[in-house]
Amino acid sequence: MQRDYLIRVETESMPDFKRLNGLMIGFVIKGEAHIYDENNMTQCNSGDIFIINHRDLYRFQLQQDGIICYIQFQMKYLADKFDDAHCLYFHLTDATTTKNIHQLRNIMARLVSTHIRHNELSKLTEQQLVIQLLMHMIHYVPRTYHSNQSILNDDKVNQVCDYIELHFHEDLSLSELSEYVGWSESHLSKKFTESLGVGFQHFLNTTRIEHAKLDLTYTDETITDIALQNGFSSAASFARTFKHFTHQTPKQYRGDRPAITENQQSAQHNYHDRELILLLNDYIEEMNHFIEDIEKMNYKEIAFKPTNQQLNQFNHIIQVGYLRNLLNTQYQSQLLTCHHDFQVNEVLAYDVMPYIMKKLNAPFTYDAEISNIFYDIDLCLDFLLDHNFSLTMHLNQYDSRDYIDAFKVFIHHVALHVSHRKDLKFNLYVTTLHTSLIEMIDYFKALFPNGGLYIHLDQATERHLPLLKRLEPHINHFVFDANSNDAVDFNKMNDDEFKTASQMIINKTNYLIDLMHRHNLKRPLILLNWNTLTGDTFITNGEYFRGGIIIEQLLKLSTKVEGIGYWLNYDLHVSHCRNERDYMNSIELFHQYNGKRPVYFTALLFNKLTSNILYSDDTCIVTGTDSNFQILLYDAKHFNPYLALDNQMNMRATEMIHLNINALEDGMYKIKHFTLDKENGALFNLWRKHHTIHGMDKDSIDYVNRMSFPKLEVYDIDITDTLALNIKMITNGIHLIEVKRYPSS
């Protein structure tokens, strides 16, 4: 691989300038080095990185005990890897984050250390690290494309030089190259000499000789083979040309360097391999990935400007099924966790009237002096009161006299129970309309003047419009359901269906808003039961990650819907479903054993956004102020969830987003970066890996719950005008970056 790249450690200064063909990146291992180009000198201290680009003049001068290392890529190697490699120009700036500098230095230190060790796997490891280094530079080091560099004033001469660098080993002629650029031979020869100070043949031979020197130094190939593979017609022609340029024969040149081998070249001056490896170890950190699997690059420039847009946070309504489930300490703990993380303050419970009617009509009579038929209900109410939760109760089949009487008994008891404490925030929710509701609401409002009424709204509601109008003064919210899975047949591959499904929730929301407008109904909306595309979750769980799709829906709904509903956990949700299709109508926050599902973290991250919108587009929103802001980036790809199971379809894609936030006030900022994607926070991905035929034991459960969290990175950065972030986005992933400027000292 020495024809492709060089790995060197230098302990001695360069006496003269050289012009680089290719790309060089390195860092100071120890001491101090001065890196010179045509116009400037850069002082580099221990750990500092330097980059020298194609055709740059350079020289380095090492101070006492100074050591540098570098990797030099040949242009032919780069041209095989990148389009327009000869125009690629890397430059480290203030926008290059400390994290990225550390990672570059880490990769180089590993690469040089591996090269010095020179064991049986060194070559393979070297090649992996070289690719990692180039990938990291492409993704994280600012770069531009220079079609004209200072060495050449004429673009066509530049093209000829690039062509020679890539094809020096072929039979090249002035005639061929003049045809390549569309000039006559004489004109090209004249322009070439004017620009470079040497003729075409001299430049071609110089290029060939420089490459031949590498082969003589680092390979055992015969001189004849080296001559032929570097563009010379014979060994004799090569020997004559080589002696003309170096004043030595190829054999003499190789004989003067018998002691230099691939691993010994690094141990120049007074340093042994072991000492160099110990010095390099100071720069080596753990690496998560060997090869970056980036498939797409995206560049985003953001400048804040005043907007009239506001982001509204949701009131979260958590369904728990039967009220008595609130007596379960695990469920209580889950509710309190939700309350802490994203301000959940409302619980929706099933109708308790059938339970009360059963007790009231029991064959034996409860002795009111020694028993309380509402004992368990009171304990549930106490929990809600203690933690400031509101209670919404779903009334169902309330058109009988027995039901209405039981309702009045229940409401009266609740009013008495809470009268000596603080008012319970109490709401009623009905999915069907009946005239008996008027009597019940009048009684309810007499005891709970601040109580609310939620009415389910759909097309069927229009048939009861007169009754709806009579109840309107008491109505606080209209409630609706929307399930994207209803819009598609998962056994088909019709893209139009999946496109329609991606808009299903927002389209139904807009339909109901229009319905309310037509009938002059002005109340906020609650989306109670809803879901994005999932398919059969028993199959797709752990494979189809959809956090970005959920966050996309929340952002679209934030100005249209006041409340969002979730089931508390998997067991409660499943126990109240008739079948799998019914289960697909809603989303739960927790799985079994208190494992938090990605939707939980989606709600948590969304809750970190503030109301003032500074910037927004199809995949990004920024909220806050210019000194304390939150950046939310997400990917939302709507496709058949079953395709996530097919490795041949490869629906998982990775995008690198280069994000610049411009015109920031200079200063030190704190960065908190949350990543939620299939690799970070996806519960079922880990669940499947640790599940056995006998289930999961406590150790496995605890481990999965500990590891199923979004990744968090925290660091400080000194910003001058621009914050540059490089974000690796996996399909349907979410990134939230909190940025806060420290006060000036």
From Swiss-Prot:
It holds the Pfam family HTH_18. GO terms for molecular function: DNA-binding transcription factor activity; sequence-specific DNA binding. Residues 158-256 form the HTH araC/xylS-type domain. The keyword Nuclease does not apply. InterPro entries: Glycoside_hydrolase_SF, Homeodomain-like_sf, HTH-like, HTH_AraC, Tscrpt_reg_AraC-type_HTH. Keywords: DNA-binding, Repeat, Transcription, Transcription regulation. Residues 175-196, 223-246 bind DNA. The keyword Transferase does not apply. SMART domains: HTH_ARAC (SM00342). This is Uncharacterized HTH-type transcriptional regulator SA0097.
